[in-house]
Amino acid sequence: MPIFKKTLIVLSFIFLISILIYLNMYLFGTSTVGIYGVILITYLVIKLGLSFLYEPFKGNPHDYKVAAVIPSYNEDAESLLETLKSVLAQTYPLSEIYIVDDGSSNTDAIQLIEEYVNREVDICRNVIVHRSLVNKGKRHAQAWAFERSDADVFLTVDSDTYIYPNALEELLKSFNDETVYAATGHLNARNRQTNLLTRLTDIRYDNAFGVERAAQSLTGNILVCSGPLSIYRREVIIPNLERYKNQTFLGLPVSIGDDRCLTNYAIDLGRTVYQSTARCDTDVPFQLKSYLKQQNRWNKSFFRESIISVKKILSNPIVALWTIFEVVMFMMLIVAIGNLLFNQAIQLDLIKLFAFLSIIFIVALCRNVHYMVKHPASFLLSPLYGILHLFVLQPLKLYSLCTIKNTEWGTRKKVTIFK
């Protein structure tokens, strides 16, 4: 990033944090809301500070036998074809490309893929297409490919994702470090321009990768290698394959949360990292109902795998600390809001209510300050994501925790692609 842009981000962040400190300490003092504010400000400073120290891996990748695995279920036909074409266009050669249809009721996508592979024989010699008769879930679709490949490295790609031509080559640079066992790239919303929700989602994605994963990568412990674009060494996948397919939680089979699960397997062996120069675009939900279903699934996966991560506090304390921070911030926010609403000692009036809403807005701007140099106009929408986060996503997260044993997690039935 040019020094001018980096300086602008730092100065803007310092300015926003200064306002945040004033509103927090002078209006809420040592109350629960004030204490939460202090911890939140500290956490924001740590994450942004670490992200500024982040540098992508460089050098030329070693020679690996790489297999791409693309599971698909009721995917839009053109979307799946575009995904395949983007994988075929990689600058780093792939030994195998597996497309596994997981028992889709709508077979248009897999039929289009089969026609394309049969027609474009010269460029599709290494493409293996498989149709499962029964829908068993993404894990089993991936496992079908894992079990049949002798690759050194597995590239996982979602069926609604476009990966940039050099994405695999850039990811593999991280494997020059033999202690790295998994890596993920940078994700943005392909349909960002569709509506307000997709714009807000893209803002969230950019922060989740450009700040959060960049900060975690500096410690060698990103918590989630994202499904749209990640690589894993063979040693991560094959020894854990049966455990991956048959994972249970509270006595019930687990059908999603595969990205976090595979990342935890990699963490057991070594480092997990983020490579900002490996990029992809993916379709995101454009309807609130679909978006909330997605968030509900992710929330349940977050809580389940967080329990596993916290258990690593002796073997891998950094992973446990990142996880504990995320869980504690969520719980403290719930307590702070409850205290603000029901504790008469705080004496909530219009001024403090306005200050509290201002804090929400400024925190959202702080979280996404780096987005200012990428999409300045969209950056100004950040406070709207703050409102969505506080009044919709946080209650949903609490609901997800309370219903974590419910295995009907709303797997998508249909995906719409936007050009």
Curated annotation (Swiss-Prot):
Q: Does the keyword Cell inner membrane apply?
A: no
Compartments it resides in: Cell membrane
Q: Which GO terms describe its molecular function?
A: hyaluronan synthase activity
GO BP, one example? extracellular matrix assembly
Q: How does it sit in the membrane?
A: Multi-pass membrane protein
Catalytic activity of the protein: [hyaluronan](n) + UDP-N-acetyl-alpha-D-glucosamine = N-acetyl-beta-D-glucosaminyl-(1->4)-[hyaluronan](n) + UDP + H(+); N-acetyl-beta-D-glucosaminyl-(1->4)-[hyaluronan](n) + UDP-alpha-D-glucuronate = [hyaluronan](n+1) + UDP + H(+)
Q: Which Pfam family, giving just one, matches this sequence?
A: Glycos_transf_2
Q: Where is the signal peptide?
A: none
Q: In which pathway does it act?
A: Glycan biosynthesis; hyaluronan biosynthesis
* GO CC terms in record: plasma membrane
Q: TM segments?
A: 8-28, 33-53, 318-338, 345-365, 376-396
Q: What is its EC number?
A: 2.4.1.212
Task: Please indicate which superkingdom the organism of origin belongs to.
Answer: Bacteria
Q: Which UniProt keywords apply?
A: Capsule biogenesis/degradation, Cell membrane, Glycosyltransferase, Membrane, Transferase, Transmembrane, Transmembrane helix, Virulence
| Necessary cofactors | Mg(2+)
Q: Name the CDD domains on file.
A: CESA_like (cd06423)
Q: What is its main location?
A: membrane
Into which family does the record put it? Belongs to the NodC/HAS family.
According to its UniProt entry, the function of this protein is described as: Glycosaminoglycan synthesis. The hyaluronic acid capsule is involved in the pathogenicity of group A Streptococci; it may be the major virulence determinant.
Question: What is the protein name stated in its UniProt record?
Answer: Hyaluronan synthase
Q: What is the lineage of its organism?
A: Bacteria, Bacillati, Bacillota, Bacilli, Lactobacillales
